[in-house]
């Protein structure tokens, strides 16, 4: 019965899906007509005055630092005040693209959900962009941590380009209107992408204490998958934390994606090796690096035939019956005609194109039959002596180690070059990159408050504007109607099956009910009645025996305690009868 119900349900479900698919367009038209009617009724019932637009669920208020900061800008004043556009040219580049003439503007995001929230927007593509701003005061790397944080939104996605910031080193030569790619920086931090290579840079320039030369040190790549931050067109919060104990953390949206130590997790390492390979050392001419050599005592066997071919004709093969030896595999096309403009003087004698011989279609083959080629069992190839261990093997040669003349040990790489400005020096093939809410300070609490008042509001507004789970499922199904079938099979069908099995099962047999409830059944009652009869009969026999024993006892007392031989014989017989009555063999058979 359950199988029939299930089969019926599947048939009904399949019919409904087909009808829904066939009538999709008609349903859409009917729904649109109904909506038009409802809209007309509502418009007729509305007053003439236009209702004011609904206010956003999240109200924006420009963030304000809650403590001392080295730099903070939310751009909500609507101008580039405090920022300086570069007028420099990039060296070693064609004049057409050497200028830093990329456009910057302060504007809201194209799909802003927070009216009034503005940011710095990189407007142009395929151009060099450079803009910078002075800090309130230079940052000195002493006993306080450094925290850098800002927001990025790739509104159009990103093909190839960066959105990283540079913390420009404090030098007498620093001129922000000449900011370019060679301007000295202390730290570079932020996202960068080209092709399918998604990066989150953290680079600092370390000064060699012996030579005074600066060298870039790159943090290890994050283990997290960064692709979503570049492709989802949402605003993401990037945070760098450097501590005086040389530890660092990189966070995206307030979650750690990379961490480590400046001494252990940078490439190349901050401190060089104590020893290096001697550049003057040379490998001896007789140094043998061969682990295996040909056996010098091996001899080629006399029966080794190096000239035997790898393939030979199969001598056991026979020509298939019906093979057409006299028919060519291809013949001129009889329907082909010489083109009218064919010039035999210029083009030569015209020949019809070749086509497959139609006579060969019904035959196993045409033309000269040849035996197929097979592997030659006697083929051995060119003989080579076997390889043996080289008795003169000395291993792979390496130059000897010597003390590194350039060795130094800097145990406090956190004490970097002070910086006094922040800058964006970028090339991008995608426009409309949105930057917002830059902050540099030494207090994590201040940075978190700034993030909650800025990025936190964006996140809340995005969440309020996004549909719920059901809404997202409906939107996806509207774009891909086949998802309705998936929803039905994964949601409705299991629910129906649960109801079917729980509420419409078959009536159980009486025997099953008996096992569950211990209620007596007809055959069980009869069996119990038989048992009761046997029990009553046994009780009567026991009572009779007891009376007989009492009588015998009284007689024995009257006779002076003697027992006759007859009574002694009767007693074992009564015991035998009792045993036989209790034996299972004497019970009545159970009636089915």
Swiss-Prot record:
Keywords: Acetylation, Calcium, Chaperone, Disulfide bond, Endoplasmic reticulum, Lectin, Lipoprotein, Membrane, Metal-binding, Mitochondrion, Palmitate, Phosphoprotein, Repeat, Signal, Transmembrane, Transmembrane helix, Ubl conjugation. Residues 21-481 are lumenal. Its main location: endoplasmic reticulum. Residues 503-592 are annotated as: Sufficient to mediate interaction with SGIP1. Residues 503-592 are cytoplasmic. An alpha-D-glucoside binds at residues 164, 166, 185, 192, 425. This is Calnexin. It comes from Pongo abelii (Sumatran orangutan). The gene is CANX.
């Amino acid at each position: 019965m359950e199988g029939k119900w299930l089969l019926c349900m599947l048939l009904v479900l399949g019919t409904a899906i087909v009808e829904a698919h066939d009538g999709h367009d008609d349903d859409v038209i009917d729904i649109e007509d109904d909506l038009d009617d409802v809209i007309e009724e509502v418009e007729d019932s509305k007053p003439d005055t236009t209702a004011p637009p609904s206010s956003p669920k999240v109200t924006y208020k420009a963030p304000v630092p809650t403590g001392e900061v080295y730099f903070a800008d939310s751009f909500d004043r609507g101008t580039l005040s405090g920022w300086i556009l570069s007028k420099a040219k990039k060296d070693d580049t064609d004049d057409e693209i050497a200028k830093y003439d990329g456009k910057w503007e302060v504007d809201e995001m194209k799909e802003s959900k927070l009216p009034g929230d503005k940011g710095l927007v990189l407007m142009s593509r395929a151009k060099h962009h450079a803009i910078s701003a002075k800090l309130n005061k230079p940052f000195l790397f002493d006993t306080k941590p450094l925290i850098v944080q800002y927001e990025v939104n790739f509104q159009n996605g990103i093909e190839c380009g960066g959105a990283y910031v540079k913390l420009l080193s404090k030098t007498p030569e620093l001129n922000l209107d000449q900011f370019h790619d060679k301007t000295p920086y202390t730290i570079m931090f932020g996202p960068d992408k080209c092709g399918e290579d998604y990066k989150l840079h953290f680079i600092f320039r370390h000064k060699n204490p012996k030579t005074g030369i600066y060298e870039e040190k790159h943090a290890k790549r994050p283990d997290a998958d960064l692709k979503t931050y570049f492709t989802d067109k949402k605003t993401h919060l990037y945070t760098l934390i450097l501590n005086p104990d040389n530890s660092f953390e990189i966070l995206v949206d307030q979650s750690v994606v990379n961490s480590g130590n400046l001494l252990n997790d940078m490439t190349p390492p901050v401190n060089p090796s104590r020893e290096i390979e001697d550049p003057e050392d040379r490998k001896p001419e007789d140094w043998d690096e061969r682990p295996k050599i040909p056996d010098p005592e091996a001899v080629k066997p006399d029966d080794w035939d190096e000239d035997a071919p790898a393939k030979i004709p199969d001598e056991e093969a026979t020509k298939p019956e019906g093979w057409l030896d006299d028919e060519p595999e291809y013949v001129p096309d009889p329907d082909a005609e010489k083109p009218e403009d064919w010039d035999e003087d210029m083009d030569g004698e015209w020949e019809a194109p070749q086509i497959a011989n139609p006579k060969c279609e019904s035959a196993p083959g045409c033309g000269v039959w040849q035996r197929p080629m097979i592997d030659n069992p006697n083929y051995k190839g060119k003989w080579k002596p076997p390889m043996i261990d080289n008795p003169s093997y000395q291993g792979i040669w390496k130059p000897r180690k010597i003390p590194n003349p350039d060795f130094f040990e800097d145990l406090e790489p956190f004490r970097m070059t002070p910086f006094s400005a922040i800058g964006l020096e970028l090339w991008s093939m995608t426009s409309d990159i949105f930057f917002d809410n830059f902050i540099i300070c030494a207090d994590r609490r201040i940075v978190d408050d700034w993030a909650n008042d800025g990025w936190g509001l964006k996140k809340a507004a995005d969440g309020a504007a996004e549909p719920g789970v059901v809404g997202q499922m409906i939107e996806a199904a509207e774009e891909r109607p086949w998802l309705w079938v998936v929803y039905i099979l994964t949601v409705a069908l299991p629910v129906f099956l649960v109801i079917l099995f729980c509420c419409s099962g078959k009536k159980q047999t009486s025997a099953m009910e008996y096992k569950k409830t211990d209620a007596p059944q007809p055959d069980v009652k009869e069996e119990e009645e038989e048992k009761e009869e046997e029990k009553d009969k046994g009780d009567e026999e026991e009572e009779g025996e007891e009376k007989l024993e009492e009588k015998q006892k009284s007689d024995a007392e009257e006779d002076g305690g003697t027992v006759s031989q007859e009574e002694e014989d009767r007693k074992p017989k009564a015991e035998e009868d009792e045993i036989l009555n209790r034996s299972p063999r004497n019970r009545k058979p159970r009636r089915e």
